[in-house]
Regions:
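Acidic active-site catalytic centers that drive phospho-/nucleotidyl reactions
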Residues: 41, 45, 64-65, 85-88, ...
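DPxDG-like acidic metal-binding loop motif
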Residues: 75-148
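An extended, acidic
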Residues: 155-271
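Residue-level signal for inorganic ion chemistry
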Residues: 18, 41, 52, 90, ...
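Solvent-exposed alpha-helices and their adjacent loops that cap or buttress functional pockets
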Residues: 29, 73-76, 120-121, 140, ...
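N-terminal subdomain of lithium-sensitive/metallo-dependent phosphomonoesterases centered on the IMPase/IPPase/PAP
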Residues: 1-87, 111-114, 245, 259-260, ...
Length: 271
């Protein structure tokens, strides 16, 4: 699939830029409470957008840092939409923790009934790429073609009970208090809980069997789009936290190997 191969190349180039620029030092800015952005985020996004536009000038782009991409006329006219996070895990990056990545997803649109924030889309994810430059791990998938890590096919774990599983979550800047009772409930249910600080990698780690379940609130489409497809192609399940069909713009997500999914939903329903 050419568009997937192009996305893989673009993700690697962005990852190389992140490593190169990180060695030069950088200024940290705040987008909001506990929400950081660096010049490296912006440089990575600028490169990704430039490369996409050079290859696919008629495609639309939804990107984390560049607000103008949300209002392009091409959004309504484009058949394909690229959903990109140029540096997922910025706080880790800013503190020298090597758990961060580039996330790129490609959405094939059928119809759009959009508000100014484009909070409703009809279509399907056709490709997803997540590249972790510090570990040189490239996760990717295309619809109905399986999921891969550095060229090797991956699948979710076979853990059947949360008591035997390793779960993971995150605390977005605006949803910390909301997640506390869920964290407490899962802490009692799980073998252990981790908090990595990169939603895209949390999802990919489920896809390759490192984690068994994941939930988080208050996310954006660029946080989860690529990872959601990669999990599904690896045999896992992705919904919202109530077990309903995932809405990329719905902010809340529950993902698992599929075997512990119902148990996690039931745990959440008791909160």
């Amino acid at each position: 699939m050419k568009i997937l191969e192009d996305a893989k190349i673009i993700a690697r180039k962005a990852g190389e830029l992140i490593i190169r620029e990180s060695d030069k030092g950088f200024k940290i800015e705040k987008k909001g409470i506990n929400n950081l952005v660096t010049r490296v985020d912006k440089a990575s996004e600028k490169l990704i957008i430039k490369l996409i536009k050079a290859l696919y000038p008629k495609h639309a782009i939804i990107a984390e840092e560049s607000e103008e991409t949300h209002t392009k006329k091409t959004f309504k006219e484009a058949k394909y939409i690229w959903i990109i996070d140029p540096l997922d895990g910025t706080t880790n990056f800013a503190h020298g923790v090597p758990i961060y990545c580039v996330s790129i997803a490609i959405f094939k649109k059928s119809t759009a009934q959009s508000t100014k924030n484009y909070d409703y889309l009809s279509g399907e994810l056709v490709a997803g790429v997540v590249y972790a430059p510090r570990t040189d791990e490239l996760f990717y998938a295309s619809a109905k073609k399986g999921a891969y890590l550095n060229g090797k096919k991956i699948k979710v774990s076979n853990v059947k009970k949360t008591a035997e599983g390793l779960t993971v979550t995150g605390f977005t800047a605006t949803q910390r208090e909301r997640n506390l009772p869920y964290f407490q409930a899962m802490l009692k249910k799980s073998q252990a809980i981790r908090r990595l600080g990169s939603a895209a990698l949390d999802l990919c780690y489920i896809a390759c069997g490192r984690f068994d379940g994941y939930w988080e609130f208050g996310l954006k489409p660029w946080d989860i789009a690529a990872g959601a497809l990669i999990i599904e192609e690896a045999g896992g399940t992705v919904t919202d936290t109530n077990g309903n069909l995932l809405d990329l713009f719905g902010a809340d997500i529950l993902a698992s190997n599929g075997k512990v999914h119902t148990e996690m939903i039931r745990t959440f329903q008791k909160i």
